[in-house]
Amino acid sequence: MTGHAPDAVWPSASPPPASPALTWQLHDVAELPGVRAQLRRNTTSESSDPDLLDQLILAFDEMASNALRHGGGRVQASVRLTPDSYLIVVSDAAASDPPRPAVGRDPSEGGLGLYLIAEMATEHGWYVEGGAKYVWALLPRR
């Protein structure tokens, strides 16, 4: 899928600067359908390509659901704008647990979200700040 080794941790790096965001405090994966609908409504005018908008929604959902399932609580998700990209940033309380793509797992068991996001993103990474882990991905919007 990517040029990275299958067991590679996402790169440790800060995201590029971006403008103010749509932000959500998340507590349960059951909230995600409503958040996806809000995200779609609020970003439709930012992208002229419906496929790019679909990729944004998919990447956001994968990142947010990973944080809710594995992040130890206190999940915040945001979508910010750069001149030509969407910046998705998701934080959780699992600061010592870097994002790791699933290795050696049957694809039917899931766990391919990080691979998918890395393929769609022009850049991606993670960093720790204030005791929280921040995972981010930059996706084109034009």
Which residues does each PLM region occupy?
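Short, well-structured hydrophobic secondary-structure segments
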Residues: A59, A64-R69
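Conserved beta-strand-loop-beta-strand hairpin that lines the nucleotide-binding pocket
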Residues: M1-H27, L68-R142
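Conserved short strand/loop->alpha-helix "switch" segment adjacent to the catalytic nucleotide/phosphoryl-transfer site
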Residues: P33-D61
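Conserved long hydrophobic alpha-helices within structured protein cores
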Residues: D28, P33-A37, V90
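Charge-dense, low-complexity intrinsically disordered segments
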Residues: L26-V29, P50
